[in-house]
């Protein structure tokens, strides 16, 4: 039911346009595990399915064919001999769907977790190729929808297939995690009454993954929920990290090594530095891993301002992973009430400061909207300059820079606090000095604006007047543009 879907307006529009088109459609919906792909399709179209089945993790070909046979009998109302191959299976599916061509305006087939059907030596891809190219692609009322969480498979075998399925997908839809606005709507739909500070901290821990958010119990506070989900004995999310990577990526060990390395470097690392640290001799697998991790929103690729030629930086930005690696992985003994006991501790303050920076990077469009520059061409950078005493070069770092076509550069400070942030005279001088260091290092002629992105605003004082623009927490909760 459409009213049960939170957010996803653009994705719903794309799917509905495909369903209502007058041509055959091969729709591939992909994204990381637990993000709500299956839920979206079932809520939107479940009552209209002419056939549905799902792959199951680590099931054999024979088990999957047996399940296919059961589903076909369920939808067709006729029991047939169990197929021995995927060629036979798709032939039976074609025969059944052919009986619907005249009576149904839309014939919707939904195959969920498609990658898990492609077991070794199963010839699944070839059979799917023959089904689509040999018949379904000529039927204007066929709407073939597939979903998959296994990113390596989806990008290599389907979306990037060089064989018969190359360019056959008519619509690719990537389902991203919720933003803050969608997270708030989701929690409200569950009867959870929290402040926006609490919702933001929840987002900083779990990210915008609906499956995780759905585990929250409305009768408990945020710290109590985090203790139960992450730190209590048998906590549901304490082992999620391992399975998440195994289910998404074929070579999950390499992907975890990359992520765990990047977790140690807040500003990120270059490709060459990652290769050297992991003792990799070939860059092919690393390039594929980077692309997959970016496409699943685990990491981001960015350029340092003025240093494009020195190679891109790769930075871990997935909030759940950052939290897990910081507080859970490798900890043999954990306090079952760790998060409740950590409120306002030095460790909590240090973590929340960095996590808030990552939250801001997930909401660049909301920041641009507040600054009134949605229609202005803007490049997003970070910047750092290492100190060199011999050359008289001072060190400096800016985590978010918005380089605008209208001759302004926003140098952004991201600050998380429960009270209005107090810009002291000493801190203002530090900001002004850093702005001048950046001006000299970048040799820019653009106007440099000091911009604060804060969780609780800026305290009104003499120094506050030197700040050109401010983005607040409520602005970050704005609807995605």
Per-range role (PLM):
Residues 305, 312-481:
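A cross-kingdom feature that marks ATP-driven nucleic-acid transaction machinery
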Residues 1-341, 346, 450:
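Phosphate-binding site recognition
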């Amino acid at each position: 039911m459409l009213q049960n879907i939170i957010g996803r307006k653009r994705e719903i529009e794309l799917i509905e346009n495909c369903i209502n088109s007058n041509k055959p459609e091969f729709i591939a919906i992909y994204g990381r595990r637990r993000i709500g792909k299956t839920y979206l399709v079932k809520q939107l179209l479940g009552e209209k399915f002419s056939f549905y089945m799902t792959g199951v993790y680590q099931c054999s070909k024979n088990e999957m064919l047996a399940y296919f046979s059961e589903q076909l009998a369920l939808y067709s109302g006729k029991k047939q001999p169990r197929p021995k191959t995927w060629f036979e299976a798709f032939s039976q599916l074609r025969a059944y769907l052919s009986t619907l061509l005249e009576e149904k305006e839309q014939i919707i087939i939904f195959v969920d977790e498609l990658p898990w059907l492609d077991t070794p030596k199963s010839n699944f891809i070839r059979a799917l190729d023959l089904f689509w190219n040999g018949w379904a692609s000529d039927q204007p009322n066929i709407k073939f929808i597939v979903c998959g969480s296994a990113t390596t498979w989806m990008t290599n075998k389907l979306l990037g297939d060089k064989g018969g399925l190359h360019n056959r997908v008519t619509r690719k839809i990537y389902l991203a995690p919720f933003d803050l606005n969608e997270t708030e709507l989701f929690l409200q739909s569950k009867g959870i009454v929290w402040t926006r500070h609490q919702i933001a901290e929840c987002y900083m821990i779990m990210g915008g993954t609906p499956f995780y958010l759905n585990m929250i119990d409305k009768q408990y506070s945020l710290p109590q929920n985090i203790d139960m989900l992450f730190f209590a004995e048998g906590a549901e999310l304490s082992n999620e990290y391992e399975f998440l990577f195994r289910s998404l990526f074929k070579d999950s060990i390499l992907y975890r090594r990359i992520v765990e390395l990047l977790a140690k470097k807040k500003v990120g690392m270059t490709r060459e530095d990652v290769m050297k640290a992991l003792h990799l001799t070939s860059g092919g697998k690393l390039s594929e891993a980077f692309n997959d991790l970016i496409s699943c929103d685990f990491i981001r690729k960015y350029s340092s301002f003025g240093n494009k030629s020195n190679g891109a930086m790769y930075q871990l930005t997935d909030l759940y992973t950052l939290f897990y690696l910081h507080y859970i992985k490798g900890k043999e003994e954990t306090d079952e009430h760790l998060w409740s006991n950590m409120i306002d501790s030095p460790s909590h303050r240090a973590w929340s400061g960095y996590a808030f920076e990552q939250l801001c990077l997930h909401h660049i469009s909301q920041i641009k909207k507040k600054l009134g520059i949605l229609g202005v061409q803007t490049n997003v950078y970070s910047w750092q300059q290492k100190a060199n005493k011999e050359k008289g070069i001072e060190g400096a770092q800016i985590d978010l820079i918005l380089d605008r076509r209208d001759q302004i550069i926003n140098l952004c400070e991201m600050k998380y606090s429960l009270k209005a942030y107090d810009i002291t005279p000493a801190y203002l001088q530090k900001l002004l000095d850093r702005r001048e260091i950046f001006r000299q290092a970048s040799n820019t002629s653009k106007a440099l604006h000091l911009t604060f992105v804060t969780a609780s605003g800026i305290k009104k004082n003499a120094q506050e007047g030197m700040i050109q623009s401010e983005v607040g927490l409520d602005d970050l909760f704005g609807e995605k543009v």
